[in-house]
Swiss-Prot record:
Pathway involvement of the protein, from the record: Cofactor biosynthesis; 7,8-dihydroneopterin triphosphate biosynthesis; 7,8-dihydroneopterin triphosphate from GTP: step 1/1
Record carries keyword Nucleotide-binding: yes
Annotated family: Belongs to the GTP cyclohydrolase I family.
Keyword Hydrolase: yes
Catalytic reactions of this protein: GTP + H2O = 7,8-dihydroneopterin 3'-triphosphate + formate + H(+)
InterPro entries on file: GTP-CH-I_C/QueF, GTP-CH-I_N, GTP_CycHdrlase_I, GTP_CycHdrlase_I_CS, GTP_CycHdrlase_I_dom
Source organism of the structure: Corynebacterium efficiens (strain DSM 44549 / YS-314 / AJ 12310 / JCM 11189 / NBRC 100395)
HAMAP family per the UniProt record, alphabetical: FolE (MF_00223)
Residues that bind Zn(2+): C85, H88, C158
MF-aspect GO terms: GTP binding; GTP cyclohydrolase I activity; zinc ion binding
SUPFAM superfamilies xref list: Tetrahydrobiopterin biosynthesis enzymes-like
Protein name from the UniProt record: GTP cyclohydrolase 1
Length: 197
């Protein structure tokens, strides 16, 4: 699957295993010792799963809709997300809040599709800002939503376990589209609901 960020090749298990083996050697480890013998294969399999979103298409995730003639907010809060910082290849994790108002057709998608959409984009080398925008844009482009609000709150291990070492710090990003972008009252309402007020 390729998108505007560039072409994506199929996962290469053998190449991934060789790269992990070389990394172990580069950091001073012995990949032949008992505890590390299977590590290259294990890490490669884990990365196949962790980065599975590179090979998924948002159109396939949002392909099933229902005609409910619903013109009001649909909001799913506190969807757990796990992603990988593209700068350091360490995890960031937290929750996504995804809300939308259907387009004029009143088409809605299943609630689980919102979680699947978040997972699909999270399972890539990512930055939180892009992840937030990709989810919002997919709901506009693929579902035809007239208004979208996405908020992600996440802890980044690249900040917690290395560098500045501030574990527990939470980064919040938002992306608003349509009416939530143009109407301050609508934006305030959806953000209050996201906060649980």
């Amino acid at each position: 699957m390729a998108d505007k960020l560039g072409a994506v090749r199929e996962f290469d298990q053998e190449r991934a295993e060789a790269a992990v083996r070389e990394l172990l050697i580069a950091v001073g480890e012995n990949p032949e010792r008992e505890g590390l013998l299977e590590t290259p294969a294990r890490v490669a399999r884990a990365y196949r799963e962790i980065f599975a979103g590179l090979h998924e298409d948002p159109t396939a995730v949002l392909n099933k809709t229902f005609s409910e003639d619903h013109q009001e907010l649909v909001l799913v809060r506190e969807i757990p997300i796990y992603s990988t910082c593209e700068h350091h290849l360490v995890p960031f994790f937290g929750v996504a809040h995804i809300g939308y108002i259907p387009g004029e057709s009143g088409q809605v998608t299943g609630l689980s599709k919102l979680a699947r959409l978040a997972d699909m984009y999270a399972k890539r080398p990512q930055v939180q800002e892009r992840l937030t925008s990709q989810i919002a844009d997919a709901l506009v482009d693929k579902l035809g939503a007239q208004s979208v609000a996405v908020v992600i709150e996440a802890e980044h291990l690249c900040m917690g376990m290395r560098g500045i070492r501030k574990p527990g710090a939470v980064t919040t990003t938002s992306a608003v589209r349509g009416g939530f972008k143009t109407s301050m009252a609508s934006r305030a309402e959806v953000f209050a609901l996201i906060r649980g007020n």
